[in-house]
Regions:
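Acidic/polar-rich alpha-helix caps and helix-coil junctions
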Residues: 1-170
Length: 170
C-alpha cells in the first residue's frame, strides 16, 4: 500500500462540489467552474443545468438517487452521476454508495439471477445442481443465498454511514 493518499484534480473538484451542495443546498461559483471544467475535459456540453433540468428521478434506476430512505434532489443526483462517470472502473462506487447510505434500499434484498426453470435442463446446470452448488427458492437462481450471512440476515445488510470513519490508505 501507498504511504500517502493520491487525489486527482477531478476528485478534488467533485468532493468540493458535493460538499458545497450538501452544506449550502446551492452551487457557488467555484462549484460551477469546476463542473464546467470536468464536462469540457470529457467532451460533453458544459451546460450542466440542461442535464439537471432533463433529469427525471422517477425514471432513474440507480441506487445513488437515495440517501437512506429519502430521495435526493436532481442537482445532488447529477453531482453523484458525474462522480460515477468520472470514476468508472476505479473501485470507488461501493464506497460512495455506502457513504451516501444508498445501499439502505437493498436491506433484506435477495439478488436473483437468470430464470432457473428455463435453464435447469441444460447439462452444465444439472451437474451444478447435483454438486449442491445451486440454490433456488424461486424460478430465478439465487446465487448468493448459499452464503450463511445472507441467509441469517434474510438478504443483504449494511451498516449506516459513518462520516467520521477515517479514509483508509489500503
Amino acid at each position: 500500500p501507498l504511504a500517502y493518499m493520491i487525489f486527482r484534480a477531478s476528485e478534488a473538484y467533485l468532493n468540493y462540489m458535493e460538499a458545497d451542495y450538501m452544506k449550502n443546498k446551492n452551487l457557488d461559483d467555484y462549484s460551477k467552474k469546476y463542473w464546467r471544467a470536468l464536462r469540457k475535459r470529457a467532451g460533453v456540453s458544459e451546460n450542466f443545468q440542461k442535464t439537471i433540468d432533463a433529469t427525471d428521478l422517477s425514471k432513474e434506476n440507480d441506487l445513488a438517487v437515495w440517501s437512506g430512505s429519502q430521495m435526493i434532489d436532481k442537482t445532488l443526483y447529477n453531482i453523484r452521476r458525474e462522480r460515477r462517470c468520472e470514476f468508472i472502473a476505479e473501485g470507488m462506487r461501493k464506497d460512495d454508495l455506502l457513504r451516501w447510505r444508498s445501499l439502505d434500499k437493498m436491506k433484506n434484498y435477495q439478488t436473483e439471477g437468470f430464470n432457473w426453470q428455463e435453464y435447469q435442463k441444460e447439462p452444465y446446470y444439472v451437474k451444478q445442481l447435483a454438486a449442491g452448488l445451486v440454490v433456488s427458492n424461486s424460478k430465478y437462481l439465487r446465487p448468493h443465498f448459499a452464503n450463511e450471512l445472507i441467509i441469517t440476515n434474510n438478504g443483504y445488510n449494511f451498516e449506516e454511514a459513518n462520516y467520521l470513519t477515517p479514509i483508509s490508505y489500503d
